[in-house]
Amino acid sequence: MGLKTKATTFHKLGYDYIKYFQKNPPAVANENLLHQTIKQFLKNDILHHDSALKSFVQFMACYLNIPEENDAFDSLGEKLDVKNGIDFETLKSKYYANTSGSRRISKNKLDTFSGERVKSVEELMIANFLFLNGVNYEYEKPYPHGDHMYRPDFYLTDYDIWLEHFGIDKHGRAKWLSEFQEKQYITNMHKKRAKHHLYRTKLLETYSWYNRDNILLDKLREMLEKSGVTFQPLSEQEIYDKIIKQDSSFGAEIISLITSFINLSKSRGLAANGLRKFMEDSETDDQFMNARRQLFLDFALPIIEKYNAVLSARGEIDFNDMINQAANLVRQKGITKVYDYIIIDEYQDISAARFKLITEIRQRSGARLVCVGDDWQSIYRFTGSDISLFSDFGKFVGEHEKLFIERTYRNSQQLIDISAKFIQQNPQQLAKNPKSTKELDYPVEFAAPDQNNASTVLVEQICQIVAEGGAEQHILLLGRHSFDLDYVICQRNNEGKVIKDQLREEVKKYNEATGALILAGFENVDIKFITVHKSKGLEADNVIILNLKNDLYGFPNKLTDDPIISLLLSAPEACRFAEERRLFYVALTRTRNKVYLLTPENESLFTKEIKRYSNYLIQGRYGESELVSCPWCKTGRLIIRQNSQTGKSFVGCSHYPHCSQSYNNVEILSKPILCPSCRSGFLVRRHGRYGEFLGCTNYPECKHTLQLSN
């Protein structure tokens, strides 16, 4: 075409400007330096920052997890699904476990001195508050009076005081439950109060609405002081030494949050002083979130100062500094070359700093701007990318024309229909209607391994793909995290012991750099394992997505969606797990044929959602017809449990202990008939004066009956 063109990366473009205007340009730091600096600060340096240490301990103890309002969910089960994977182990448990040197604690073991896990974020706040202030307590200690088993939430052992936390609003309502369930909940609350009154035991109460107004801990302190409880706060340094320094994973979740926070703040050109003011200007009526942001800043700002000092001492700048400096140089000194057109590829990954650099160049050259990208595939927020610069394009560039390329050649139309419906559940994604000439029934297949046979299921899945398509094809194994392959290679039980190693025996060679995986019996099949982030832009004949479980480090990863990060975006995203949703869309669309989803029993929120669509197949022992949903929480599964004391079998919810619904009639699993009146019990055979009939398991609260003749 005879056009003079120059192709470059943002990295090279920015550094070229710095080299042109500066005689001795600084070197660019290794991208791992930030992570190393944060880790070093949290391990050692923080001990020399009293205010940072105090805020960090308080943040980790009471503010790391956000107690969302119950009415933000359609059911208790939806809330439990979203919160699943949160570490509900108390600080007291972590402290004494590290003191004793033993951490072999079953995750579901409750009410023990070491291994103590509570049932909600608010209970965790209360337990940690009591421990930090030296108030001895027992969690769910059996109440010593009365005929029926009753376990109040907390018992203050030195003061003979009981404490209950009720999930009600200011009007004494539990609107997050169904009408019948709310009535039961409120009735039980009154019964508990009456029991304490009858036996003249002291009961203190806290409520969920306290936390909404960020007065939970203040109210708790006030009540305890009025009741004569003496506070003897533990040393923050002692807490830190016993818990954080002794447990390498305890602070791991916060490192990722701080990394994203620093990258985004630097990309926006916010220095330490500017960040403090920015956060103050962002305050809302939500006092809990305001306090949370303040605590976070108290220890994040010293880390930023430390990181900048390390860069300065090494004579280096990081990528964000480089782009910001280049933009400032263009603004102050002008441009080195005039452009007629600036074309940006992969525009969905643009950051505030990169956009500022391009804007400075455009304003001085009059260049037309052409941006090519797909907002459905914006997955690099942790490096500073800001999707709103794409989705709100006109707001930032003014008059523009938008063109859609909606013809695709990789995926079948059936897979496009599923993946497009999934990604557009986020209303902030641009609406598109992609089309393909390829047709393929059931492009999504589910396989359901349990904790003992994930390796076997993966091998069987590969066998099926080879049997249907031959050995000369490319199979891509995808994981949300790099350790997802380890999950299927080395199966472990709840205590972490290796219980199956089948796939490891099959692995003849694995190249971590390229992802190439050679399995015995499949030597001629091109198999690779990579993370979903690394798969962007790639494709394969068939794709298997591993380890799709609902967990903190599952898919979605629940640590990437923190509101502190959203504040630094040009337009915060309201959709829960928005970036993780885009990442899952990328995973679904890498295949030219089928995508196979390996979903354990505790399956991903995303795979549950896709099962509400059409064009998929389910294989494996967890077929939908075999499962009975818990009518109380809506999303748990009813399973047979056994009373550890009596040995008697009963039916309980898979969400236990967070959903404690249970039934004595195990026959409801073979023929479940949901009670049409209360819709939380089941109809079972009963004997009456006139013979057999069907009655509700919630009797006497629900008196619905049905004659067997009907």
Which positions does each model-derived feature cover?
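Helicase C-terminal subdomain and adjacent C-terminal extension
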Residues: 565-575, 579-671, 679, 690
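Short beta-strand-loop-alpha-helix junction that forms the active-site gateway
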Residues: 151-189, 363, 375-377
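Accessory N-terminal region flanking or inserted into the helicase ATPase core
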Residues: 61-115, 235-341
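Helicase P-loop NTPase motor core
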Residues: 399-401, 408-521, 535
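Conserved P-loop NTPase-based nucleic-acid remodeling module centered on helicase motor cores
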Residues: 2-65, 197-256, 531
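Conserved helicase C-terminal RecA-like lobe
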Residues: 83-85, 471-474, 486, 496, ...
